[in-house]
């Protein structure tokens, strides 16, 4: 049961992480490299 819960958490987190990376890269590409120090 723990493995199923862990795999569900991983399968839920991986697309969100990839989507977040794409969104941040897209926003930095749109605005130029002015906002690289905002994190």
Swiss-Prot record:
Functional note: Component of the cytochrome b6-f complex, which mediates electron transfer between photosystem II (PSII) and photosystem I (PSI), cyclic electron flow around PSI, and state transitions. PetG is required for either the stability or assembly of the cytochrome b6-f complex.
What subcellular locations does the record give? Plastid, Chloroplast thylakoid membrane
Designated name of the protein: Cytochrome b6-f complex subunit 5
Q: Give the membrane topology.
A: Single-pass membrane protein
Alphabetically, the GO molecular function entries are:
electron transporter, transferring electrons within cytochrome b6/f complex of photosystem II activity
Task: Identify one Pfam family in the record.
Answer: PetG
Annotated GO biological process: cytochrome complex assembly; photosynthesis
Task: Report one GO cellular component.
Answer: cytochrome b6f complex
The gene designation is: petG
> Self-association or partners: how does it assemble?
The 4 large subunits of the cytochrome b6-f complex are cytochrome b6, subunit IV (17 kDa polypeptide, PetD), cytochrome f and the Rieske protein, while the 4 small subunits are PetG, PetL, PetM and PetN. The complex functions as a dimer.
Please report which protein family the annotation says this sequence is part of. Answer: Belongs to the PetG family.
The protein's UniProt keywords, in alphabetical order, are: Chloroplast, Electron transport, Membrane, Photosynthesis, Plastid, Thylakoid, Transmembrane, Transmembrane helix, Transport
Which parts pass through the membrane? 5-25
Keyword Glycoprotein in record: no
Q: Does the keyword Transmembrane apply?
A: yes
